[in-house]
A protein has these predicted regions:
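Sec/Tat signal peptide C-region and signal peptidase I cleavage site
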Residues: 13-23
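Mature soluble domains of exported/periplasmic/lumenal proteins and thiol-rich metal-chelating peptides
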Residues: 23-127
């Protein structure tokens, strides 16, 4: 019984430490982008790129307002999907900052090779 209890205690401790290591609060800076279009074409970082059909401008804002993922593209090329409070209500708090350089603060995690930031605050750096 003591060995079982000791084993469970160690397991719980290891899991607790692992969880903290994978979800750390950080402040990241970069450009807010339309994640779907960026994956299709790395040059689609501005708000003025057109829809894939080529018939509608301002794809980034249109897609973000429909709830498509917005991401933070850092200077080293990493892409963090923005989740959490700032991405709520179809990215309402992010749309006006698309293509701008910003700082986001929130819990950063990686799941299956996808980086996310559950952003709680945004600071505009430049347009």
């Amino acid at each position: 019984m003591r060995k079982l209890l000791a084993g469970l205690t160690v397991t719980v401790f290891v899991l607790a430490v692992g969880t903290v290591a994978f979800a750390a609060t950080q402040t990241l800076s970069g450009q807010l982008i339309d994640q779907v279009c960026y994956k299709m074409n790395k040059s689609n970082t501005g708000v003025d790129h057109k829809m894939p059909s080529g018939d509608e401008a301002n794809c980034a804002a249109t897609c973000a307002k429909m709830g498509q993922p917005v991401a933070l593209l850092t200077s080293d090329g990493k892409v963090y999907t923005v989740t959490g409070d700032l991405a709520a209500n179809n990215n309402a708090k992010l749309v006006s900052h698309l293509s701008h350089k910003v700082e986001l603060t929130g819990d950063v995690a990686e799941t299956g090779g996808t980086m996310t930031i559950a952003a709680t605050s945004l600071k505009m750096i430049s347009k």
